[in-house]
Regions:
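Short juxta-domain linker segments that transition from a proline/glycine-rich
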Residues: 1-151, 156-232
Length: 232
């Protein structure tokens, strides 16, 4: 697990939890995470059936994973350029796709980590800046190719379009103000995965095809995307 509960003494287990969150007391935990929650909450309607402590733990694990990666100064131009190469990785989906994705982003100063979801979180991903370094945290919760890649490009949109002080957590409900930025990130992701123009072209042709699955696979290669993003 993420926290060492091997010690028998309750106080030692308690200290292990504090150590995981890098705080010295329960009050320090609430103080730190209430500030983080406030940064998100002004755009959130509610957390629904999500456990906020599990959400905090998931976010914290992402920070720990990010700290294990080298830090490189962020370069927006290089990151935007890398997205074209990442689109090709998405289309081909090699076995080491995540390592390639992580490496290309890191060269542009963006850390990308994969953190499995905890119970009662159901989060797709998150974007935030930690010590002036961009972090994209992905869960691949549903183990679906299309959701994974859409979430990545959505988070990339937040990095390129929105402020460094903002925290974005996908899988939560947002206020009208916050939803505007979510919609902007969605539109950004659509351009890289399966654009509206590409979708329109598909619908103009597919109903005349006898083998629609074969056509989708061919069309995906033509527009440099993965068939799963088309089928959705």
């Amino acid at each position: 697990g993420w926290i060492d509960y091997s010690k028998n003494e309750i106080i030692e287990q308690f200290n292990a939890v504090l150590s995981f969150f890098s705080v010295s007391s329960v009050d320090a935990y609430h103080s730190h995470y209430e500030i983080e929650e406030a940064e998100v909450a002004f755009r959130m309607i509610n957390t629904g059936d999500k456990n906020k402590h599990n959400v905090n733990a998931w976010l914290r694990k992402g920070e720990i994973q990010a700290n294990e990666l080298p830090t490189i100064e962020f370069d927006a131009t290089k990151f935007k350029s890398a997205l074209d190469s990442i689109k090709t990785i998405m289309a081909n989906h090699p076995d080491n796709f995540f390592e390639q994705l992580q490496s290309l982003c890191l060269q542009a100063g963006v850390k990308v980590v994969h953190t499995p979801c905890l119970p009662k979180t159901r989060l797709h991903g998150s974007t935030r800046w930690i010590n002036n370094t961009a972090l994209i945290q992905l869960s691949n919760q549903y183990q679906r190719n299309d959701i994974f890649w859409f979430t990545f490009f959505h988070e990339a949109g937040h990095i390129l379009k929105h402020g460094k002080k903002e925290v974005f957590v996908e899988g939560l409900q947002y206020t009208a103000e916050g939803q505007i930025k979510e919609d902007e990130a969605d539109k950004f992701a659509v351009k890289y995965t399966f654009s509206e123009k590409e979708e329109e072209t598909l619908y103009q042709k597919i109903f005349n095809e006898e083998d629609q699955v074969k056509f989708i696979n061919q069309y995906a290669k033509e527009i440099n995307t993965h068939p799963a993003t088309i089928i959705g």
